[in-house]
Amino acid sequence: MCGIIGYSGPRPAAEVLLKGLERLEYRGYDSAGIAVVTDKAYIESVKKSGKLNVLKTCLERRTTPIVGSTGIGHTRWATHGEPSDRNAHPHMDTEQSLAIVHNGIIENSDVLKRELLASGKSFTSETDTEVVAHLLSDAFKKTQDLVQAFVEVTQRLEGAFAVVAIHKDQPNTIVAAKNNSPLLLGFGQGENFLASDIAAFAEYTQRVANIDQERIVALSGDSVYITDFAGHPVDYEVHTVSWHPASVDSSGWSSFMLKEIFEEPQAVENTLKGRTEDGTVILPECDHIRDDLLAIDRVVLVGCGTAAYAAMTASYSIEAWAGLPVSVELSHEFRYREPVLNSKTLAVFISQSGETMDSLMAVRYARQAGVKTISVCNVMDSSIPKESHAVIYTKAGPEVAVASTKSFVCQIVVLYLLALYLGQLRGFRSIFPRQKAVCELNRLPVKLKQVLEIYESVRQLAHWMSDSRSILFLGRHAGYPIALEAALKLKELAYIHAEGFAAGELKHGPIALIEPGQPVFVIVPSPVGSPILHAKVISNIREIKSRGARIIAIAAEGDSAVLPHTDSVLRIPLTRYSFEPLLSIVPLQIFALELAADKGFDVDRPRNLAKSVTVE
């Protein structure tokens, strides 16, 4: 991991590569580098650990610029070896005739490395990538063709990978191999691109082709050639995407994350658009599996991190509105515990990027078990949608900040829609309550805008609490996963201890953490929507308040019962009980962002995190 860019064409390659790497920064990284085949037919490579600016400064200080029109670039997120200059990509062979960049993990790299060491090869890094560089170099010496070298080497590699290479003896050519790691082509006028993300080349073209699994690609400025791993030519399809570089511009905002939080009302509106009519839900994406959905008797929701919490949040609504039992699984645990699955199981996979490797592997596992699969993703034409029976896209737009915000709320909205759709198909409950739910669902964009009006109050609260070393979050019912997500956001951004608990679990252990001054956020259900749960949560608040905790409540407008027992109250508009979690998370997202910003941290690119986790 984490970001790849390749370019061949008339432009100065180094400039194109650096711009591409800038667009890939949001994916998270710890080092960066480029390699270019120069006009004098040798490869020049520069790589540095740290931020991209370190690499730029190094290039600016050179007495002679790197001149060449074909090259590759990489931002690295360490998986093998510490973040350092020597472990940064690109990596080269011993003769400095070949350079490669690589995303993924070569699972048998230790075995291959021992073979290479025994043959006299030496290594300058700790990475699995350098192993591939030596293998390709040896294969090229035999074949004198980089595509054929890849055909030979890919037979020996185990794991998920995207490897991209240049060779001084084929100066205008880039060759790449893809196996379960994101890689796509961009087609320009007399120039072509390779990248792990369209953001890397969207400034130049929106004509793209997705590369299938187990493919080798050779490109120059005026040609593209694709084979399978056996070297047999294969066809590909070019299409135009609607994606503008301005969508990843944070001008006028202090951070992408803040911009994206304020985009949530529009993102939810876009996600709902065209999917409801006269109180019913319309999901044409699922029409072709309608009969299968009528036959299901249970639902499994699968995701990682924030996506898993979106699944947990919506699971209550699926059970209530569709009358189906629901379980929520972590993608990386799902296929290793022999889950009981059959043809009457519906598995729904949630992933912002559509490339989360754990979730992709889980999709394949489910399909092999005869399960019908639906994916909920934000990135069009990504791997998980292509391998699912159906996909319902969130329409959040590009999300640049590593910590997910608008995608999270849109994932929940899509799952609400799916819950109502399944209820319609099954004739579960009467039409009237369902129509009321759809009507209130369509009011959420306006109510999200109202929540954003308390931004300044939340910012001041974060400043007041910036010295906190531990913060707890409590919720009940669908407020519980919101507590988990709020704690995750604080850990991701502010690097402090935070935990989310089901409020009813307090007396079973967590109450031991409460001491005078301990900050505790409590997500309070509305007394209108659920008076019983509201009373229970007020009881929980009183328990911890009596032990000296500092209570901050997220509560609906008009709820006066919280006032005597809390230190602060952040108000959300009154809405249907099922939808309260969607509004409750917004001030908690803002709080995490502002607390981290107050500490001086980069809220868009938190340490050690990647936007798209494409390795297991």
From Swiss-Prot:
GO terms for cellular component: cytosol. GO terms for biological process: carbohydrate metabolic process; fructose 6-phosphate metabolic process; protein N-linked glycosylation; UDP-N-acetylglucosamine metabolic process. It is found in: Cytoplasm. Coiled coil: none annotated. SUPFAM superfamilies: N-terminal nucleophile aminohydrolases (Ntn hydrolases) (SSF56235), SIS domain (SSF53697). Its EC number is 2.6.1.16. One of its GO terms (molecular function) is carbohydrate derivative binding. It comes from the Bacteria. Its main location: cytoplasm. Pfam families: GATase_6, SIS. The active site is at C2, K611. It catalyses: D-fructose 6-phosphate + L-glutamine = D-glucosamine 6-phosphate + L-glutamate. Residues 289-428, 461-606 form the SIS domain. Residues 70-89 are annotated as: Disordered. PANTHER family: GLUCOSAMINE--FRUCTOSE-6-PHOSPHATE AMINOTRANSFERASE, ISOMERIZING, GLUTAMINE--FRUCTOSE-6-PHOSPHATE TRANSAMINASE (ISOMERIZING). Homodimer. This is Glutamine--fructose-6-phosphate aminotransferase [isomerizing]. The gene is glmS.
